[in-house]
Structure formats: C-alpha cells, structure tokens
Regions:
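Cyclophilin-like peptidyl-prolyl cis-trans isomerases
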Residues: 1-161
C-alpha cells in the first residue's frame, strides 16, 4: 500500500494540556482510546497527525501475538514500513506502564519510533522503559482481543476535548 511519506516528524500541532481521543474502526469492531499528551506529547502529536492525514486507514494489523499484543501502523505490512522519519522515545518521566489495554509505540530499538504501534492484551512489564506508552483503551478491549493477523483498520478518527 502506497502511503504519503515525510522527511521529518510533524511539528507540534496538539495542545498537551488538552485531552485527545481516537476511534479506531476495524473489520472486527471499534476501539476507543484516550491519549495522555502530558506524558508523551511528541508521540500523541505524531499519532494524531498521521491519523488526520489518513495514514492508518486501510492498513492491516501485521503482527498479532496471542496474550501479548496486536501491532499495526505499517503501510507495507512487513513490519519494516513507516512514514519515512523517526523520532525519540518518551519514556523518561512517563509514569504510564504496559498494563492491559495500553497503546504504545513499536520500534526497532531506542529512538526509532515512526508510525507503528501496538495495543496490549495483558500486562507486559518487560517493555516498560523500552517503548513509549501514550494512551489507554477506554472501550473495545474485546475487539483488540478478537483481532487476528491481517485484520484491517478501516478508519481512525481523532477527537479533542
């Protein structure tokens, strides 16, 4: 799938003092997420930017590991694709941990975040400090648990409150 690419991460477009929510519509149902920009402003800004650009629409969950997580955000579906830029982790001073139903950035090592994210099925404390947690599922954990490899994201919508 050909998606737009950028040479740099997006400029800050969100207000970290506001609350942001995403609705991820998939072929298995809807997942509602609340983001925490006060702990991971660059990461939330990045997800909001990509969602508003339609980057995630039509992309599959290319990696699903039972009782662990679902991973999406790669337009190539190989686990190697992204928006053509990388940005740093936001784990220092971030009190959010890898509990059940959190959304976190997938990466290929420190400071290699792009567009790929994962949502946990269960607590994954071994990932704390290695991946930026930036939100929590508020509705649809049953959908997360039902998603299988190859299921697709239909649309991601962002709301600000």
């Amino acid at each position: 799938m050909n998606k737009k690419q950028w040479s740099n991460p997006p400029a800050m477009q969100i207000d970290p003092k506001k609350t942001y929510h995403a609705t991820i519509e998939s072929n298995k149902g809807t997942i509602e997420i609340q983001f925490y920009p006060q702990y991971a402003p660059k990461t939330v800004n990045n997800f909001v930017f990509l969602a508003q650009e339609g980057f995630y629409d039509g992309i599959s969950f290319h990696r699903v590991i039972s009782n662990f997580m679902i991973q999406g955000g790669d337009p190539t579906g190989t686990g190697r694709g992204g928006p053509d830029y990388r940005f740093e982790d936001e784990v220092k001073g971030n009190p959010l941990t890898h509990d059940t139903g959190v959304i976190s950035m997938a990466n290929a090592g420190p400071n290699t975040n792009g567009s790929q994210f994962f949502i946990t099925h269960s607590p994954q404390p071994h990932l704390n400090g290695k991946h930026t947690v930036f939100g929590k599922i508020t509705s649809g954990q049953d959908v997360v648990n039902a998603i299988r490899q190859g299921d697709t994201i239909t649309k991601v919508t962002i709301r600000e409150t």
